[in-house]
From Swiss-Prot:
InterPro entries: BioC, Malonyl-ACP_OMT, Methyltransf_11, SAM-dependent_MTases_sf. Its EC number is 2.1.1.197. Pathway: Cofactor biosynthesis; biotin biosynthesis. The gene is bioC. It comes from the Bacteria. Disulfide bonds: none annotated. Keywords: Biotin biosynthesis, Methyltransferase, S-adenosyl-L-methionine, Transferase. GO terms for biological process: biotin biosynthetic process; methylation. Belongs to the methyltransferase superfamily. PANTHER family: ARGININE-HYDROXYLASE NDUFAF5, MITOCHONDRIAL. It catalyses: malonyl-[ACP] + S-adenosyl-L-methionine = malonyl-[ACP] methyl ester + S-adenosyl-L-homocysteine. This is Malonyl-[acyl-carrier protein] O-methyltransferase. GO terms for molecular function: carboxyl-O-methyltransferase activity; malonyl-CoA methyltransferase activity; S-adenosylmethionine-dependent methyltransferase activity. Gene3D superfamilies: Vaccinia Virus protein VP39 (3.40.50.150).
């Protein structure tokens, strides 16, 4: 179990709500891959758990589904509602879903469960509110994600603003009591400069540490050091994400 400050996470994503869609390329790429595992596309009651500003809520609604958008961040829900992305909007925590058993045909959670204190509980909750014959689809980040950031930060006399993600084996263990199938993918994204890479993390609310929060501003000298040590190639300054996709069919 991880030590997670839910209020701080909600605030971090709340601050990012207005700019989230500009920086959410990873979420969209990951979500498109996750959607490929769906057995049905329309005519379902769908829960988007950890909906953010509702990009995939809108995707599922446009496909002909009744969508409930849930998020820990009130600001994200305001953004989702302003864009008319779903049919219902519900503040809530994935680890304590405010729904009855078997409420949805599809429980969808794209890059949200990594913020949970207890992944096993989160997966159990998603499974609980899924109807028999329905499906749970989720994606998350695993250990070694953002290793380029860790490597570049090491020479600096500062704590790296890198969240601690669970290793793949721990993710599998969290769902061992459930009919869970996992797939893995590594996605590497290039940025034109170090600031763009850092802003991509801040823009999606992902700079909050599970255990404490990095404080202080980066100096010009720090940025120069990061540029020297940050792994890069023809694509630019790199950030790699180790993605895990989970599929559960409700029995």
């Amino acid at each position: 179990m991880q030590t997670v400050n839910k209020q701080a996470i909600a605030q971090a994503f709340g601050r990012a709500a207005q700019s989230y869609n500009q920086h959410a390329g990873l979420q969209r790429l990951c979500g498109e891959e996750l959607a490929s595992y769906a057995t049905r596309r329309q005519g379902q009651k769908v829960l988007d758990a950890g909906c953010g500003p509702g990009w995939f809520s809108q995707h599922w609604r446009a496909a002909g589904n009744h969508v409930t958008a849930l998020d820990l961040s009130a600001e994200m829900l305001v953004q989702a509602q302003a864009l008319h992305t779903a049919d219902c909007y519900q503040p809530g925590d994935i680890e304590a879903l405010p729904f009855s058993d078997a409420s949805f045909d599809l429980c969808w959670s794209n890059l949200a469960v990594q913020w949970c204190s207890d992944l096993s509980l989160a997966l159990t909750e998603l499974y609980r509110v899924t109807s028999p014959g329905g499906q749970v689809l989720f994606s998350t980040l695993s250990a070694d994600s953002l290793h380029e950031l860790s490597a570049a930060w090491q020479p600096l006399d500062l704590p790296a603003p890198v969240n601690r993600f669970l290793p793949f084996d721990a993710i599998a263990h969290a769902g061992q009591h459930l009919p869970l199938t996992l797939m893995q993918q590594t996605l590497t994204v290039g940025f034109p400069d170090v600031l763009s890479a850092l802003r991509s993390l801040k823009g999606i609310g992902a700079t909050h540490l599970h255990q404490g929060r990095h404080g202080g501003l980066l100096s010009r000298r720090h940025l120069q050091q990061l540029e020297q040590h940050w792994p890069r190639d023809r694509r630019g300054y790199l950030l790699s994400y180790h993605l895990v996709y989970g599929v559960m069919h409700r029995e």
